[in-house]
Curated annotation (Swiss-Prot):
Domain PRC barrel: 99-172
Function: An accessory protein needed during the final step in the assembly of 30S ribosomal subunit, possibly for assembly of the head region. Essential for efficient processing of 16S rRNA. May be needed both before and after RbfA during the maturation of 16S rRNA. It has affinity for free ribosomal 30S subunits but not for 70S ribosomes.
GO terms for biological process, alphabetical: ribosomal small subunit biogenesis; rRNA processing
Domain-related comment: The PRC barrel domain binds ribosomal protein uS19.
Subunit description: Binds ribosomal protein uS19.
Family assignment from sequence similarity: Belongs to the RimM family.
GO cellular component: cytoplasm; ribosome
Protein name, entry field: Ribosome maturation factor RimM
Record gene name: rimM
Keyword annotations: Chaperone, Cytoplasm, Ribosome biogenesis, rRNA processing
Cell compartments where the protein resides: Cytoplasm
One of the Pfam families matching this protein, by short name: PRC_RimM
Length: 180
């Protein structure tokens, strides 16, 4: 497995390696994409350290995939991969998203502004703890807050221009008073 740190720039996590499946090096793979079969078309995947993984075989089993990676020939080697997150470079992904769909990597770093254009901070992360997506926002003050990534709180997302517009009240950043 080759090492390539350059591929980690603007990466998108597509899968997480799970437990071994059988004795010949296959692993269960939790795919984080809505189109699991597309995973093999991306070619080489990379982990956090830049090591590469080439899919030799992929077949679906319920919500998971069973995958065989080149060079992983036994259960012990497969077990050593457990928990590794697999990424692809953002520029390899197809841009066939709908108007309300975004890749997480495209949201991180966007300026956050209110309806008047006042810059409040920038997006520093995206989370989902089960009740809906939350944007992590680093305010201009240095404080970090979570805001709902909903149509009520986030009024506009403009990836090309590098900003998103929030309603400070709906986002929980203001109580609606004048000094906010």
């Amino acid at each position: 497995m080759k090492y390539n740190r350059e591929k980690l720039k603007n990466k998108v996590c597509l899968a997480i390696i799970g437990m071994p499946h059988g004795i010949k090096g296959d692993v269960l793979l939790k795919i984080l994409s809505s189109e699991p079969q597309r995973l093999k078309t991306y070619g080489t995947l990379y982990d956090d350290r830049g090591h590469s993984y080439e899919i030799v075989m992929l077949r679906m089993q319920k919500k998971n995939a069973i995958v065989h990676f080149k060079g992983v020939e036994d259960r012990s080697a497969a077990e050593a991969l457990r928990g590794i997150h697999l990424y692809v470079a953002r520029d390899q992904l197809v841009d066939d998203l709908t108007e309300d769909e975004f890749y997480q990597v495209d949201l991180i770093g966007l300026r956050v502004q209110d309806c008047t254009g006042r810059i409040l901070g920038e997006v520093s992360g995206l989370f989902n703890f089960g009740a809906g997506d939350l944007l992590e926002m680093r305010l201009n003050t240095g404080k970090t807050v979570l805001i709902p990534f909903s149509k009520a709180a986030v009024l506009e997302v403009c990836i090309a221009s590098g900003f998103l517009v929030v309603d400070p009240v709906a986002a929980g950043l203001s109580d609606g008073g004048e000094n906010t």
